[in-house]
A protein has these predicted regions:
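Conserved alpha/beta-hydrolase
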Residues: 96-119
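Alpha/beta-hydrolase-fold enzymes
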Residues: 160, 165-252
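Acidic catalytic loop of the alpha/beta-hydrolase fold
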Residues: 291-295
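An N-terminal hydrophobic leader/cap segment in hydrolases
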Residues: 21-54, 60-69
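Short beta-strand/loop motif that positions the catalytic acidic residue
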Residues: 280, 286-288
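Short alpha-helix in the alpha/beta-hydrolase fold that links the catalytic acid
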Residues: 282, 296-305
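Catalytic active-site module of serine/aspartate enzymes centered on a nucleophile-bearing elbow/loop
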Residues: 316-350
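Alpha/beta-hydrolase active-site loop
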Residues: 125-145
């Protein structure tokens, strides 16, 4: 099985774009025209366009680009989602970044959102190995971000997206200026068995043929009270995201599979290796949530300390999904990103 760091996964040349970057395009190959779901309180950002890509291993990804109108912009944010998310969940964030002068490119990871599912049971979150996510990111960078979006490029990643960004860091050195990782999935919060134990159990189950089985029964509808959920303290954004999931359930997932869990644990454990940490070469700010009960804040802070180009800060009392949090937390995150990205205004191409 390929690991996240294997050179065999460096395959940018294999991506094929399926459509033009224009709202007026017509698909000539019979491919479904990409669409986005709008609900009350979650409008699609102005200037957002979308399309599909096919990766080198023949998986279809849905992507979106939202460049800044006008003659000047501050570069492009490559926005990386967490597990069980979709482009629509970030409409508000895309609009906020546009208002600050940044263009945005984002996409749905394989197996979730509007991208191709990997199992017949489409509600299960599944990958065979972590390197598949690196294929997705490389494809979008080479086929959308670099040719169609303005430099400089910055990564803004949440949770699982942060873990992927870290493993892609050595490949992004010559293209990405800086990365801001929000509550990255580097370790699980307290109360979860150790990564070593989970790794042994998940690997054993996978080798016994249970890789495509769910880790647990779906609990997507169990938490109904915004005050008690682990993701956000903001009632309005919580309700908006629930409405989105109810309106477009095909975009979202239930349980991850055993193979997904095994791949994540292997990727997290690699980041405890000194050689892996030494290869993290893009300047990176890790932002942790003070009230996070999903991922380990301490593990993320220790990684930042060990990185030669890393730093960290904490948003006190914020829950795991900081871009879905109350304004008093969310605005801090946006200000931090803005300051870390710096004054990188460039003239946009005419």
């Amino acid at each position: 099985m390929l690991s996240a760091g294997d050179g065999a996964l460096q395959l940018a040349e294999g991506c094929v774009r399926l459509n033009a970057m224009d709202r007026e395009y017509e698909m000539n190959d019979g491919t479904e025209k990409p669409s986005f779901v709008e609900i009350s309180g979650n409008p699609m950002p102005k200037n957002l366009v979308g399309g599909y890509l096919t990766t080198s291993d023949n998986k279809r990804l849905r992507y979106a680009v939202c460049n800044v109108a006008g003659s000047r912009e501050r570069g492009t944010v490559v926005l990386l989602q967490g597990r069980n998310e979709a482009i629509e969940k970030y409409f508000e964030t895309i609009a906020n970044l546009n208002a600050r002068g940044f263009g945005v490119v984002t996409f749905d990871w394989r197996g979730q959102g509007g991208s191709e599912r990997l199992l017949r049971e489409s509600r299960l979150g599944h990958i065979k190995h972590f390197g598949q996510y690196l294929i997705d990111l490389e494809c979008v960078m080479q086929e959308v971000a670099l040719p169609d979006c303005h430099p400089p490029y910055h990564v803004l990643a949440h949770s699982m997206g942060g873990l992927i960004a870290l493993h892609a860091s050595s490949r992004l050195t010559n293209t990405v200026e800086r990365m801001v990782l929000l509550a990255p999935l580097i370790g699980f919060a307290s109360g979860v068995p150790s990564l070593a134990m989970l790794g042994r159990l998940s690997n054993a189950a996978r080798w016994l043929g249970f890789g495509a089985r769910p880790v647990r029964r779906s609990t997507s509808n169990r938490i109904a009270d915004p005050a008690s959920n682990l993701l956000t303290s903001d009632r309005e954004r919580y309700a908006r995201n629930r409405r989105l999931a109810e309106t477009a359930p095909e975009l979202f997932l239930g349980s991850p599979t055993v193979a997904w869990l095994a791949a994540m644990i292997r990727a997290m454990r690699r980041l405890d290796d000194s050689d892996e940490i030494a290869a993290l070469s893009v300047p990176t700010l890790i932002v942790t949530a003070g009230g996070d009960q999903v991922v380990s804040t301490g593990t993320a802070e220790r990684l930042a300390y060990r990185m030669r180009c890393g730093s960290s800060l904490t948003i006190p009392m914020a829950r795991h999904e900081m871009l879905q949090e109350a304004d008093r937390f969310r605005e801090q995150v946006l200000e931090v990103f803005d300051a870390y990205a710096g004054d990188t205004s460039v003239l946009a191409a005419e």
